Amino acid sequence: MANIKSQQKRNRTNERARLRNKSVKSSLRTAVRSFRDAAHSGDKEKAAELLVSTNRKLDKAASKGVIHKNQAANKKSALARALNKLG
């Protein structure tokens, strides 16, 4: 346990950020998984609308600093390629 007051506050702040980031990453994984399930089943319309919402979540996570912007770009690119592969 930290003895310095500023470090104690920093620990509390970091814990709040960790929980918030964990929640955002979990919802990202769920969104990507649901898109991949739709793409794997061949439902192009559902996959297309899930791609839009997943891209929005990826962009928001990148802008908040939860994930790196290049990671978001790579995931968006891979998901778009998967959608285009459907036909």
From Swiss-Prot:
Annotated segments matching region Disordered: 1-28
Keywords: Ribonucleoprotein, Ribosomal protein, RNA-binding, rRNA-binding
Alphabetized InterPro entries for the sequence: Ribosomal_bS20, Ribosomal_bS20_sf
MF (Gene Ontology): small ribosomal subunit rRNA binding; structural constituent of ribosome
Gene Ontology CC: one annotated term: small ribosomal subunit
One of the GO BP terms on file: translation
Superkingdom: Bacteria
Family: Belongs to the bacterial ribosomal protein bS20 family.
Role noted for this protein: Binds directly to 16S ribosomal RNA.
HAMAP family: Ribosomal_bS20
Record's protein name: Small ribosomal subunit protein bS20
Name of the gene this protein is made from: rpsT
